[in-house]
Amino acid sequence: MYGIEYTTFLIYLISIILFNYILKSITRMMDYIIYKFLLIVTIASIFISAQNYGINLPITGSMDVAYVNTTKDKPFLTSTLCLYYPTEARTEINDNEWTSTLSQLFLTKGWPTGSIYFKEYDDIATFSVDPQLYCDYNIVLMRYNSSLELDMSELANLILNEWLCNPMDVTLYYYQQTDEANKWIAMGQSCTIKVCPLNTQTLGIGCQTTNTRTFEEVATAEKLVITDVVDGVNHKLDVTTTTCTIRNCKKLGPRENVAVIQVGGADILDITSDPTTTPQTERMMRINWKKWWQVFYTIVDYVNQIVQAMSKRSRSLDSAAFYYRV
């Protein structure tokens, strides 16, 4: 009897040892196969490399994150408000304490004095080169000037919308705009943009690709240019790259934490003629006062109504970061 029990025990022990050996052998074999496969893939990746030289690359990478509209009755209790105004406003008011006075007046509307920031800019052209909107809510004041009407419209179009942008190398490639939301945005001290549309044989339509003097000039010595050409047609571009940077951009939608207030002028600037601007923007309005004190008093009175037409965002627009986004 004892011999049978010992024999059974030895059989179980040998079976366990044999099963363990088989498992280890299978594990080593699988490790070998996996490591060999990874080695082959690694070596192959060194010799097989792909680079996209296409001229119509997808525009990718957004620095803006959408947030839902605030539903709080008093968002100003935990928010910041930036008020952008031209230098002429401070010059006309000529009072060293004017911002403190306005801060106290904003306090009567529920805005703590530490939540209001006054940001000065020289003029529309200068502001166009580097607009920076850092607060939860941003109100930009623009004094109407008939000679700068188009510049004001372009600036409003830029800051009232979110854009996705990629760099353009106009010296090597030709480009096309895929749809109405696709624009070329140029910024710099002096931007002159010329274009030459191409046919399917890449020959110039009404211009010579080898002679930039035959190109159509769409902008001359401007600081901000939003260029719109015929969609689906390749274009050769000539840009003053030493003083200007151009990007291939796609309009994503409204930047809802920004409002533009036009000061004076017979008509309010309208950027809704652009088919991509839908619905009609409520964040562009006009104040008809001659004196800047009157302008600021009106803004204080209606600041909460203005903010209710906006949407709080926790991100900012820095045109340098936004514009060089790849």
UniProtKB/Swiss-Prot annotation:
Keyword Calcium: yes
Positions bearing carbohydrate: 69, 145
One Pfam family, short name: VP7
Segments of this protein annotated with the region GPR motif: 253-255
Binding locations of Ca(2+) 1: 95, 206, 214, 216
InterPro entries noted in UniProt: VP7, VP7_1, VP7_2
Signal peptide bounds: 1-50
Keyword Chloroplast among record annotations: no
GO molecular function: metal ion binding
Binding site for Ca(2+) 2: 177, 228-229, 231, 301
Location within or outside the cell: Virion; Host endoplasmic reticulum lumen
Start and end residues of each stretch annotated as CNP motif: 165-167
Region (LVD motif) residue spans: 237-239
Domain of life (superkingdom): Viruses
UniProtKB keywords: Calcium, Capsid protein, Disulfide bond, Glycoprotein, Host endoplasmic reticulum, Host-virus interaction, Metal-binding, Outer capsid protein, Signal, T=13 icosahedral capsid protein, Virion
Cysteines joined through disulfide linkages: 82-135, 165-249, 191-244, 196-207
Post-translational modification: N-glycosylated. The N-terminus is blocked possibly by pyroglutamic acid.
Major localization class: virion
Similarity annotation: Belongs to the rotavirus VP7 family.
Function statement: Calcium-binding protein that interacts with rotavirus cell receptors once the initial attachment by VP4 has been achieved. Rotavirus attachment and entry into the host cell probably involves multiple sequential contacts between the outer capsid proteins VP4 and VP7, and the cell receptors. Following entry into the host cell, low intracellular or intravesicular Ca(2+) concentration probably causes the calcium-stabilized VP7 trimers to dissociate from the virion. This step is probably necessary for the membrane-disrupting entry step and the release of VP4, which is locked onto the virion by VP7.
Anything else known: Some rotavirus strains are neuraminidase-sensitive and require sialic acid to attach to the cell surface. Some rotavirus strains are integrin-dependent. Some rotavirus strains depend on ganglioside for their entry into the host cell. Hsp70 also seems to be involved in the entry of some strains.
Subunit details: Homotrimer; disulfide-linked. 2 Ca(2+) ions bound at each subunit interface in the trimer hold the trimer together. Interacts with the intermediate capsid protein VP6. Interacts with the outer capsid protein VP5*.
Protein name, per record: Outer capsid glycoprotein VP7
Phylogenetic placement of the source organism: Viruses, Riboviria, Orthornavirae, Duplornaviricota, Resentoviricetes
